[in-house]
UniProtKB/Swiss-Prot annotation:
Protein name according to UniProt: 14-3-3-like protein
InterPro entries named among the record's database cross-references: 14-3-3 (IPR000308), 14-3-3_dom_sf (IPR036815), 14-3-3_domain (IPR023410)
Gene3D superfamilies the UniProt entry points to: 14-3-3 domain (1.20.190.20)
SUPFAM superfamilies, A to Z: 14-3-3 protein
Length: 61
């Protein structure tokens, strides 16, 4: 993944999307922890996709 930013972004997006579908089944404490992690993941994904776009890559959708 280190040398494959597109793969890393796709994996992060997949993990984020799958986590969203599981939020309803979590207890309050797990929900808080999960949403924090998901926010960090999304922030990183935004950063990574903007870096990729600046380098001439395609944005992950």
């Amino acid at each position: 993944i280190l040398n494959s930013p597109d793969r890393a972004c796709n994996l992060a997006k997949q993990a984020f999307d799958e986590a969203i579908s599981e939020l309803d089944s979590l207890g309050e404490e797990s929900y808080k922890d999960s949403t924090l992690i998901m926010q960090l993941l999304x922030d990183n994904l935004t950063l990574w996709t903007s870096d990729t776009n600046e380098d001439g890559g395609d944005e992950i959708k």
